[in-house]
Amino acid sequence: VIVAIGLLDQIDERGEASRQKTQASQLLTGLDWILAENQSTESIYFGKVEAAKVASMGMSCGGLQAIQISADPRITITVVCNSGVLPDPSPIPGMPPLSKDALKDFHGPVLYLMGGPSDIAYKNAMDDFARVDHVPIVMTNLDVGHAGTYARPHGGEYTPVALAWLDWQLKGRKEASGMFLGEDSTLKRDPEWSIETKNFDQ
């Protein structure tokens, strides 16, 4: 189950200027909803949601929202895409007012999917990685900039990396860890990617 902010059938009806700003709290509202549906015998989702395996994911400002809600004890893992916490809380309206202290609230494994040095969030993300020493964390970079590979067919090169992370961390498929861990990992052997990992028991 994927809980996201907004309805797909509204996208074509809204121009760029009319797009609504969202809050991280809306993600937790969505999580509250699906977990309640999981308990309701009248819901099509009754008994179908694994409540102990929840990923918080987001891109750019949404990545900051993903970090912000990762303090919630129900969040199992975090995926931060093309994002990183600014050195000082942003004064920009609508952007999560996070400080680097938010990184201390991670309590599960974290994956960063970044666009390399040309990604506007690159320096912030690399600083995040350097600061996190209490949970397993992976930093991946593909030199595609801040827009990532989302517009490419099937989400492009980011997709197999994200799926391998979810398979490994949420589904317990240990073979998927081969994407990330060890000198012979899939991403280590791919010259297009760079990867750093730490805090894993190997």
Where are these regions (language model features)?
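Extracytoplasmic/secreted proteins, especially bacterial periplasmic and envelope-associated proteins
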Residues: T22-T29, W33, D127, E157, ...
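Gly/Ala-rich beta-loop-alpha elbow adjacent to hydrolase catalytic centers
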Residues: G58-G62, A66
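The feature captures the conserved acid-bearing segment of alpha/beta-hydrolase catalytic domains
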Residues: T76-R152
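Alpha/beta-hydrolase-fold serine-hydrolase catalytic core, especially in secreted/extracellular enzymes
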Residues: V135, V144-A147, R152-Q202
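Alpha/beta-hydrolase active-site loop
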Residues: A17-A52, S56
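Conserved alpha/beta-hydrolase
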Residues: V1-D12
